[in-house]
A protein has these predicted regions:
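Long, basic N-terminal domains or extensions that often function
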Residues: 1-234
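Glycine-rich, flexible beta-strand/loop modules in the N-terminal catalytic cores of phosphate-handling
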Residues: 27-112, 117-119, 124, 190, ...
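Flexible, glycine/charged-enriched surface loops at secondary-structure junctions
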Residues: 105-111, 146-148, 215-233, 265, ...
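Mobile "lid/hinge" segments at catalytic clefts and subdomain interfaces of large enzymes
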Residues: 142-262, 450-549
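Long, charged amphipathic helices and adjacent flexible linkers at domain junctions
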Residues: 229-240, 534-561, 607-629
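Single-stranded RNA-binding regions, centering on S1/OB-family and related RNA-binding modules
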Residues: 292, 556-558, 565-698
Length: 698
């Protein structure tokens, strides 16, 4: 087999790209990547012809987690991999975001980047290998691509940065940062952080950028040796002469007047009127009619960008640092455990919080063997009515999963520990109305919903998005605080930052250009800090200033007790008989951890206390003189057996039943009687002995 491989040392491990001419040879580009013992097969494939009737670049990125990579057989009936996991979807999105801007904007051929994880070394994260491998496979292919780009991950433990941390370090650190770069600029940022100060975050971003330059040089070397010549393609750009004719029919001033409104629906109606006018004018030109939608979009885009860049004039009339009108309210939904509504302009999110015992946390069956469950879940829904459209609901797509994960990541650093608050927590963000930055509105609504539910979060968290419009030079740019949908569509950047008053908890940066300069990155982070502090002070804190001291009226209550781990079996009983008996009698839920922590969850305080007392009785060493209440469960000639807790029985000898002599147990007791007994210790056979006559009967 003709085999060629190239290597580079990245931190502690060797990154190797195997370029086998007899592997994946029908793909346009293929790289078999190794980093330590982590192995990922990365391919880039493009269709031969452009797809007809579309006005976008059809890029698909797949990250496939094979369970054999960690020596597992998949669960489920079929015992094979099914739909992509949440982690696989999020990784696909992280790979997509830096690569998409580097493809030609007028390219309409379908492109698929496949990344198949074939083995996992816990010291070398497969997501990172897939990111770099996808870039290599695309760069060496004949697919038009203005690369290379490279990615690096940064963690932080005890204030020290760790480049490309292991799985364990990634989980334990205060920072999870992924940065993609081109030769000169940063093109993608994704971060979760434990209230990292802005200056520290910027330092980490540019440490990753430095490492990326080494990887880019490595990719350049690979392309020089095995890269293919990029193929020619049919441009789908709107002809310049069509634009000139459009301007004669609809002047730039008319277009500016159409888009200059703070109401999204009014603007859309204005554009429909313009489109109808142009459709009538071009009725004889079928070629132009076929691309009229794209042409109007481009005309509107140029108009908006000129307004912002040259005149500092936003479509809704705001100043470049101004946030849309804000409103917040809690307890808007009855009977739920917690709820909140957050509104920013024409973006509105209702969030509902639900609390449950830890047994209901999400189980995870993935490649990371250290991650088996998730206690906090945030789910984001985006129905079609929120943007005035009609579309059937097909369940959450990649966008919904990505937005949900971002708001989830934003709040994890401020959640109480399991010991402080032994609940599984789910928040659901329902998008009532959307005109940009719903993920940041979801973060604000989720935070208030948690506080309303009585979750003792450490600090309030808010989020905001910063946009960008660039000119011909790096110094010619305008940053926009709180972008609406139009500024997101026609702008160059969506820079989302969440955090507390102390620092950043999450970042997600999407761009449509070939990277950002350092002044833009620093300016966006500073702008987002000012905005989130303003949102907290003027909107969120007036609605709810601190977490409630108790969980909601309809939320389950939890009481806990620590028992000797050796007594767990006593509580569970044979085949679960004892614990199921406690649950059946009291209606509570019981969770037991391996270290002996027993959590009792319910809504009836009396029944919870009863279950707790049962657990205490079962796990306590019996002492002479202890008094119990129990039920007669068996009668013998020599005495009666009393069940004083599920699975626990003691015997009252016939001589200990009454103060006077009795001939038959049945003369005093019948099955099912509830009696009070005092413990006499254990008899010669190790059984618990009780007396009824030495304690008052009720």
């Amino acid at each position: 087999m003709d085999r060629r491989n190239l290597c580079i040392k990245v931190t502690r491990w060797i990154l190797q790209a195997d370029l086998w001419w007899l592997i994946g040879k029908q793909a346009n580009g293929c790289a078999f990547m190794h980093y330590g013992d982590t192995t990922v097969l990365c391919t880039a494939t493009a269709s031969e012809k452009p797809r007809d009737g579309i006005d976008f670049f059809p890029l698909s990125v797949e990250y496939e987690e094979k369970m054999y990579a960690v020596g597992k057989i998949p669960g489920g009936f079929n015992k094979r991999e099914g739909k992509a996991s949440e982690n696989a979807i999020l990784t696909s999105r992280v790979i997509d975001r830096p690569m998409r801007p580097l493809f030609p904007k007028d390219y309409r051929n379908d492109v698929t980047l496949n990344n198949m994880v074939m083995s996992v070394d816990p010291e070398c994260r497969p997501e990172l290998v897939a990111m770099i491998g996808a870039a290599i496979a695309t760069c060496i292919s004949d697919i038009p691509f203005d690369g290379p780009c490279a990615m690096t991950q940064v963690g932080m433990i005890d204030g020290e940065f760790i480049i490309n941390p292991s799985q364990e370090q990634w989980k334990k650190g205060d920072l999870n940062l992924t940065v993609a770069s081109t030769r000169e600029k940063v093109i993608m940022i994704e971060a979760g952080a434990n209230e990292i100060p802005e200056a520290t975050m910027i330092e980490a971003i540019y440490k990753a950028h430095e490492v990326n330059q080494t990887i880019i040089a490595f990719i350049d070397k690979i392309v020089a040796e095995v890269g293919k010549k990029k193929h020619e393609y049919t441009s789908c750009a709107v002809p310049a002469e069509m634009f000139e004719e459009m301007k004669k029919i609809v002047s730039p001033a008319e277009m500016e007047e159409a888009v200059f409104t703070d109401d999204k629906q009014t603007r859309e109606e204005n554009i429909r009127v313009i489109t109808d006018k142009l459709t009538e004018a071009f009725a004889e030109n079928e070629e132009w009619l076929a691309i009229l939608g794209e042409a109007v979009y481009q005309y509107e885009k140029k108009t908006v960008r000129k307004m912002i860049l040259k005149d500092h004039k936003r479509p809704d009339g705001r100043a470049i640092t101004q946030i849309r009108p804000l409103a917040a309210e809690v307890d808007i939904i009855p009977r739920v455990h917690g709820s909140a509504m957050f509104t920013r302009g024409q973006t509105q999110i209702c969030n509902v919080c639900t609390l449950a015992p830890l047994s209901e946390q999400q189980k995870i069956d993935g490649l990371d063997e250290n991650e088996v469950s998730k206690r906090y879940m945030h789910h984001y829904n985006f129905p079609s009515y929120s943007v005035g459209e009609t579309k059937p609901s097909r369940g959450p797509g990649r966008r919904e999963i990505g937005h949900g994960a971002l708001a989830e990541r934003a709040l994890i650093p401020v959640l109480p520990s399991e010991d402080e608050f032994p609940y599984a927590i789910r928040t659901v963000s329902e998008t009532f109305e959307s005109n940009g930055s719903t993920s940041m509105a979801s973060t604000c609504a989720s935070c208030m919903s948690l506080m309303a539910a009585g979750v003792p979060i450490k600090k309030m968290v808010a989020g905001i998005s910063c946009g960008l419009v660039t000119g011909e030079t790096d110094d010619d740019f305008v940053l926009l605080t709180d972008i609406q949908g139009l500024e997101d569509f026609f702008g160059d950047m969506d820079f989302k930052v969440t955090g507390t008053t102390e620092g950043i908890t999450a970042i997600q940066m999407d761009i449509k250009i070939h990277g950002l300069t350092r002044p833009i990155v620093e300016g966006a982070i500073a702008r987002c800090r000012d905005a989130r502090l303003f949102i907290m002070d003027t909107c969120m804190k007036p609605a709810i200033s601190a977490s409630r001291t108790e969980v909601g009226k309809y939320a389950p209550k939890i009481i806990s007790i620590q028992i000797d781990p050796d007594r767990i079996g006593d509580v569970v009983g044979q085949r679960g008989k004892t614990i199921n008996e406690i649950i059946a009698r009291t209606g509570v839920k019981i969770d037991i951890t391996d270290d002996g922590k027993v959590s009792i969850c319910g809504t009836d305080k009396e029944m919870m206390d009863k279950a707790l007392e049962m657990v205490k009785i079962i796990t306590t060493d019996f002492e002479e003189g202890q008094i119990f209440k129990g039920k007669v469960v068996s009668i013998k000639e020599f005495g009666a057996f009393i069940e004083f807790a599920p699975g626990k029985e003691g015997m009252v000898h016939i001589s200990k039943i009454a103060k006077e002599r009795i001939n038959r147990v049945e003369d005093v007791l019948t099955l099912g009687d509830v009696v009070t007994v005092v413990c006499l210790g254990k008899d010669k056979m190790g059984r618990i002995s009780f007396s009824m006559k030495d304690v008052a009967q009720q």
